[in-house]
């Protein structure tokens, strides 16, 4: 696996499962009115760059101010992988990473807010014991006090290699 790049070892490749897990996102209920927006679309002839007659379709989008809870975990990242992941999270905070479909049409813009980070060094017998005995939950002391400083430190490690 030494031939794989850090991005492949972090997010996965055809021969190796990734270390990052992002489960389905849950809607923050008070931000969603319960209705999807329906938008019109037309089929485009890619060779001519023109609309194709009779190829109209509708698609649904989530209203723009809808918020989602997101969770991300990384299993055993090395310092470079952690730095790459931190750089990606920082770009999400800045709103530079569109998500979902039709991003070239202006959909999918998002900003990550309210970041919290838990950092468990499970190579430490004491932290591993706390985690395995059920103390590795909210309020367990594994939450990083300053998530932005943690991201900065991880990103700086990319350039210290």
What are these regions (language model features)?
Residues 1-161:
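Small/polar/charged residue-enriched interaction surfaces, especially the RNA/DNA-contacting tracks
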């Amino acid at each position: 696996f030494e031939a794989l790049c850090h991005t492949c070892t972090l997010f996965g490749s055809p021969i190796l499962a990734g270390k990052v897990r992002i489960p389905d996102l849950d809607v923050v209920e008070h931000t969603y009115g319960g209705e999807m927006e329906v938008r019109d679309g037309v089929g485009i002839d890619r060779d001519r760059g023109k609309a194709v007659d009779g190829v109209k379709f509708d698609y649904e989008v989530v209203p723009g101010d809808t918020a989602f809870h997101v969770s991300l975990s990384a299993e055993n990242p090395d310092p470079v992988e952690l730095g790459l992941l931190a750089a990606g999270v920082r770009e999400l905070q800045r709103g530079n990473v569109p998500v979902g479909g039709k991003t070239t049409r202006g959909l999918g813009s998002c900003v990550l807010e309210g970041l919290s980070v838990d950092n468990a060094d499970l190579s430490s017998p004491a932290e591993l014991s706390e985690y395995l005995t059920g103390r590795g939950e909210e309020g367990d002391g594994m939450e990083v006090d300053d998530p932005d400083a943690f991201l900065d430190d991880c990103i700086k490690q990319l350039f210290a290699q």
